[in-house]
């Protein structure tokens, strides 16, 4: 499994916009907040591995 690193750019209701920090891209990934750890906010750094997000 690949490990991908993100930062939460913004939160819009029940969704969060994530930006990869380990790759050079300007695209955002829209993810339902129900799939993310509790207590996230803009600026939170996340690790995605084995289909789970973890705050780092």
PLM regions: where:
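Beta-strand/loop nucleic-acid-binding surfaces
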Residues: 26-38
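Short aromatic-glycine-enriched beta-strand elements
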Residues: 14-18
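Short nucleic-acid-contacting surface segments enriched for D/E, G, S/T with interspersed K/R
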Residues: 35-48
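Short, Lys/Arg- and Gly-enriched loop/turn segments at beta-strand edges
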Residues: 50-56
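Structural detector for short beta-strands of small beta-barrel domains
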Residues: 1-13
